[in-house]
C-alpha cells in the first residue's frame, strides 16, 4: 500500500494485470487519502473471441459503491475524449471542422454511439463485431434508446 499512498493521483487505463489485491490496495489508499482518480475506459466488460474481460468501469463502479469519491471520467462516452480528438484534428489540419462531416465508428451503444451522439457528430454502429455481434440490433437499440445514425456490419 505504501506505493499507492505515495501517488498524488491515479489514472486507470486498463485491467490486464489488475486483480482483487490491487483493487483493495487502491480502495484503502483512496479511503485514507482521497485524491484525483481518472478513468479512461468506462467499459464494464470487453468482448474477445472466446471470453469477456473485466474492464476499468467495473472496478470503478465497485469503488463508487464502496463510498469512494466519484472519479473523473475521460473515456467514451464522456465528451472530454471527443473534444481532445476534435482539437487535435483542427490543429493538424489548420482549419475548423464541420461537425456534420465527422463520424464515430464503434461497436458499443453505451460508449461509442452515445458519445458521438452527445458531442454532435455522426454515429456509425458496427453490428457484426464486438459486444453486439450475434445480437438483435433493433431490440438493443429500442431497449437502450441510443440510436446510431448509420449501421454497418463491420470492418
Roles of regions detected by a PLM:
Residues 1-155:
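Asp-based, Mg2+/Mn2+-dependent phosphohydrolase catalytic module
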Amino acid at each position: 500500500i505504501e506505493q499507492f499512498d505515495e501517488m498524488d493521483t491515479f489514472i486507470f487505463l486498463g485491467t490486464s494485470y489488475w486483480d482483487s489485491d490491487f483493487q483493495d490496495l487502491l480502495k484503502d489508499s483512496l479511503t485514507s487519502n482521497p485524491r484525483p482518480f481518472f478513468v479512461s475506459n468506462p467499459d464494464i466488460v470487453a468482448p474477445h473471441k472466446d471470453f469477456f474481460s473485466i474492464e476499468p468501469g467495473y472496478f470503478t463502479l465497485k469503488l463508487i459503491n464502496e463510498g469512494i469519491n466519484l472519479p473523473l471520467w475521460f473515456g467514451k462516452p464522456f465528451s472530454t475524449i471527443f473534444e481532445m480528438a476534435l482539437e487535435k484534428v483542427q490543429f493538424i489540419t489548420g482549419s475548423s471542422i464541420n461537425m456534420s462531416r465527422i463520424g464515430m465508428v464503434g461497436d458499443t451503444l453505451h460508449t461509442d454511439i452515445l458519445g458521438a451522439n452527445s458531442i454532435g457528430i455522426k454515429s456509425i454502429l458496427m453490428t457484426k463485431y464486438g459486444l453486439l455481434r450475434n445480437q438483435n440490433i433493433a431490440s438493443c437499440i429500442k431497449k437502450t434508446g441510443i440510436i446510431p445514425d448509420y449501421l454497418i456490419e463491420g470492418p
